[in-house]
């Protein structure tokens, strides 16, 4: 180092704080006033030597060698065998003992003494050493005595505090018992002393501050024992065996009782005896108890039952619990929360008319009723922890709002030209691609016009797609109601008006097909007036635009009306951040997996985002628009197809983009659990209703089982609703399974097991499914138009109903007189007053409009000739088989039974 090294620089070089370095220099005998002073090389070496001496190291290699020469270490190893008894046998164990000794040569050894000490000097040296040793022993004894005194005082203080706490708890317990006894007693006894006055007197002797403790028979108390200084050897033994229980020795357990207690245990040390005495003979602190009277005789007094604050007390009143119940709960969980047996809860449910097992789930209302019936209070549990986290996650994504394109839904009756109108706007040929020329899916498109971007939703007009139209009206901004000028208002037109009003969405009426010869726009306005849709011409606020989807008349005016209505609504949304929206349609593509058509309502949906969609979740693998292109992102009011979900979501579910997959998975699993529990509760209720219905109706009702598979979720929903609605009191349509995608082997097995008919709507069965269908004779039918599905199911259901026997009255004959015949008995002379009477047909005899006989017409004669029939206005003789009580004035009704095929 340089000669001009300062203390600060030296501290940086040796990585030591400046203050510490100044202290070390001062200890080495070098005084410096500040860190900026210069340190010479000599001073550095002096500091280094001081530090080496301080840490016990030699300053130079020569000194280190000399230090090593003064030490010698000897290692000794000795082997021996030890015999150990293990049960009845003895085992020899080899034991190796290793010893290590280090000998250090003193400095003066070997060098000799220059002047040997005289005997007087040696004696003085020995006396000085003895005096120093004696003084050290006295100091150590005083220190130990002081520490023992402090420890004893601390132990006594803790005991006093524990005793006071026990006394307070005992007093409170007695006061509670006396209050309960006074409340249950019929009348207080005046001569009896009050417990509150007797309690302090009973507790007075036990208080350490009020009275001295009785001395033990074996010796004096710790307070009266003289404090004699302990011998050094005793102190050493006490220091060697110091344990947790040593304070009991100080408190005076070395008495006769202790000697008797540990008789035969002389191998125990004093500390071990004290610890065992502390554990076995701890006093209960209750004067007058059996343990206090007997003392600590053999430690048995501590086995008495402790009636302190930790003892069991029987409740004096029923315990009312507050039970948190979610949407669903199993009977076993409810019983656990009520602290009851599961059988008791099941019995209570049976008394309420609910048949449930201990593992079955019940809904919140049923659980709340049975909880209140059992005397407890039910509260609704908050199970929306993940939902709350998702809501907070979505609220954090709020940002600046910008103007967004309008979402326009095209609604109307079937075949009124909705898709054709949208086709003209988009300049494509969509209508020709739909089976039967009708729309069976929700088509979502966005169109760039001269007036900006407009997103269109084309909904089906068929009656089976009610839920699709309701879903379209829910997420839309403007509804364009298409009405054919030649047909006028139809049932689905009225339904579309109701959906628009329920959603609070403004309505624009497009009167289509005005180019046809029978078009009457005024008729449309008048018919819609009955539905409270008032045109602007009539003083209302609804725009009526006359258009022609075939030639394009009025389409530009319709777009202007849509843009004007959007400006009035001032539609805004957050264009950046995490996206959220609604699922319009979903399907299962064999090559791409689950595909969901979503409408973004907030934020921007990008590739790679994690999203929760109903009970499904996943990462967006790809985005597709209606033209098949892959946009980079989709903003508000833009419909896109999403790939990458874990399953097919339900149409109408909301989706939210989250930051991580963990939150998405947790939310989806919680929703799936809730939906499954609700479905189990509903299915159990339905099964019970089915059992009761079968008990009431017998075996008369037929059941038609169906398995429905379709290409998109909306079609599955529409088919289920339409087919189940065909059920009546004679036949029940039961959809045992429905789903999206092709017909698989499991679908075929389910249909074979339940003897169901498989309906494939725009889907086909794979090879394994076809093999099962052929081998088991399962009825498999393919459809592409929903009309055909409904008609075919009606025919199949009608075939299950069989035929109906109907009675048709053919003619009525009035009895004018009765004749006797040896061959036929009584023969009625009749006049045919209605219809035709034929031979060998069943008849009824009516007397005063009451049926008195039902049988068969045996003989029919006219002018003594047998005839097959007699018509109205003619006279005849009628012989009734096995009936002779015919009287004048009776009516004979002739009828026939015919079979009529039953239909739905």
Swiss-Prot record:
Compartmental location: Cytoplasm
One Gene Ontology MF term: GTPase activity
Region (G4): 512-515
Domain tr-type G: 403-572
GO cellular component terms, semicolon-separated: cytosol
Residue numbers spanned by region G1: 412-419
Keyword Oxidoreductase: no
Stretch list, region Disordered: 134-248, 267-315
Feature: compositional bias, Low complexity: 178-230, 285-303
Region (G3): 458-461
Ranges of compositional bias, category Basic and acidic residues: 136-177
Residues annotated to bind GTP: 412-419, 458-462, 512-515
Pfam families in the record: EF-G_D2, GTP_EFTU, GTP_EFTU_D2, IF-2, IF2_assoc, IF2_N
Segments of this protein annotated with the region G5: 548-550
Keyword field: Cytoplasm, GTP-binding, Initiation factor, Nucleotide-binding, Protein biosynthesis
Role: One of the essential components for the initiation of protein synthesis. Protects formylmethionyl-tRNA from spontaneous hydrolysis and promotes its binding to the 30S ribosomal subunits. Also involved in the hydrolysis of GTP during the formation of the 70S ribosomal complex.
Family recorded in the similarity comment: Belongs to the TRAFAC class translation factor GTPase superfamily. Classic translation factor GTPase family. IF-2 subfamily.
Protein name: Translation initiation factor IF-2
Species of the source: Xanthomonas oryzae pv. oryzae (strain PXO99A)
Lineage: Bacteria, Pseudomonadati, Pseudomonadota, Gammaproteobacteria, Lysobacterales
